[in-house]
């Protein structure tokens, strides 16, 4: 019965053990006893005075967070609390619909701009992950909203409101990060073409043997910057200083992490960061990452201002289109933590 189901959320409801296709090799399991709790190791940036007299100090906080960690939390971010609450409720309601209603949106085609799927890339990977996800393209919203799920009833309206609000936040973050690199505040934004914005609503059902599998294994994000909304259940872990650190949810904050495109544009002044999602046997978990990215035709390369051959700061990466990078990212199916090395400039 379980084998015929498309989604792990429907498999989880009928099994008391992890099916063999979800079991990781012994050498690649979470080892939760070795995981540390974040404490103060993940920076928290208060954006309240970003546009006030303390801007320079906050920009310095961005520089420190991006260069030392690549992961940080933000508060006073401007996304209304009610908007966040409605988005999380809509996400829960979507995954609590009947199996027949949910699978209407199922597709394994990674090029589809709206799709429900499972794991990461089921057509390529060797071991499945304990995750279902609804992926939505959402900028420009008018190009995609009519293909989003129409149920629950308020889903499109709520998601559009959330996506619009988070995009405004991202544009503010990009200005701050650009300034923190010593660049004009619009430099990074102008590098990524017409811009792209995707969302994933990740659903991690309860798992009978969480020590055997992952929600998502260790990976780095392909995009420019990710803004993550978590529910109250812990599951995100970041690799820092040779250890996995659990990033426990903090109310009214977002988690922000840099992706591979920021690593390229900054010429490795800033780096994308390895992270993963683990599951548990007690509670389902929902996370909603917003992936902000270049448009597919955007040509990505290190910012010229950050290249100086005479001071031993050559361009580390060659020019490439984001479409080329994104296709490579999906094809790896997380067999590697990142595909960024294949885009390095030739040293021959």
Curated annotation (Swiss-Prot):
Its EC number is 1.14.11.-, 1.14.13.-. Binds 1 Fe(2+) ion per subunit. Fe cation binds at residues 219, 221, 275. Its cofactor is Fe(2+). PROSITE patterns: FE2OG_OXY. The keyword Mitochondrion does not apply. InterPro entries: DIOX_N, IPNS-like_FE2OG_OXY, IPNS-like_sf, Oxoglu/Fe-dep_dioxygenase_dom, Plant_2OG-oxidoreductases. Residues 194-294 form the Fe2OG dioxygenase domain. GO terms for molecular function: dioxygenase activity; metal ion binding. It catalyses: salicylate + NADH + O2 + H(+) = 2,3-dihydroxybenzoate + NAD(+) + H2O. It comes from the Eukaryota. 2-oxoglutarate binds at residue 285. Belongs to the iron/ascorbate-dependent oxidoreductase family. Converts salicylic acid (SA) to 2,3-dihydroxybenzoic acid (2,3-DHBA). Negative regulator of defense against Hyaloperonospora arabidopsidis. This is Protein DMR6-LIKE OXYGENASE 2. It comes from Arabidopsis thaliana. The lineage of its organism: Eukaryota, Viridiplantae, Streptophyta, Embryophyta, Tracheophyta.
């Amino acid at each position: 019965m379980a084998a015929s189901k498309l989604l792990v959320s429907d498999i989880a409801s009928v099994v008391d053990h992890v099916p063999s296709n979800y079991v990781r090799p012994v050498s690649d399991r979470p080892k939760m006893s070795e995981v540390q709790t974040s404490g103060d190791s993940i920076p928290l940036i208060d954006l309240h005075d970003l546009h006030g007299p303390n801007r320079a100090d906050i920009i310095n906080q961005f520089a420190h967070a991006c260069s030392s960690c690549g992961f940080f939390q933000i508060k006073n971010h401007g996304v209304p609390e009610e908007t966040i609450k409605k988005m999380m409720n809509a996400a829960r309601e979507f995954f609590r619909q009947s199996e027949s209603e949910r699978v209407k949106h199922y597709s394994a085609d990674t090029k589809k701009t709206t799709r429900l799927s499972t794991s990461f890339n089921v057509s390529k990977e060797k071991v499945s992950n304990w995750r279902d996800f609804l992926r939505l393209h959402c900028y420009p919203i008018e190009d995609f909203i009519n293909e989003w799920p129409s149920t629950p009833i308020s889903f499109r309206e709520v998601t559009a409101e959330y996506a619009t609000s988070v995009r405004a936040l991202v544009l503010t973050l990009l200005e701050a990060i650009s300034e923190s690199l010593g660049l004009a505040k619009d430099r990074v934004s102008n590098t990524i073409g017409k811009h792209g914005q995707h969302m994933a609503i990740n659903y991690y059902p309860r798992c009978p043997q969480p020590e055997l599998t992952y929600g998502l294994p260790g990976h780095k994000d392909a995009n420019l910057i990710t803004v993550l909304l978590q529910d109250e259940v812990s599951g995100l872990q970041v690799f820092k200083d040779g250890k996995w650190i659990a990033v426990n949810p903090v109310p009214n904050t977002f988690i922000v992490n840099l992706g591979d495109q920021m690593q390229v544009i900054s010429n490795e002044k800033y780096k994308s960061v390895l992270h993963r999602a683990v599951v548990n046997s007690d509670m389902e978990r929902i996370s909603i990452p917003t992936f902000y990215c270049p448009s597919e035709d955007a040509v990505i390369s290190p910012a010229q201002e950050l290249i100086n051959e005479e001071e031993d700061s050559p361009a580390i990466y060659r020019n490439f289109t984001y479409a080329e990078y994104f296709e490579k990212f999906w094809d790896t199916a997380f067999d590697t933590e990142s595909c960024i090395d294949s885009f390095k400039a030739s040293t021959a």
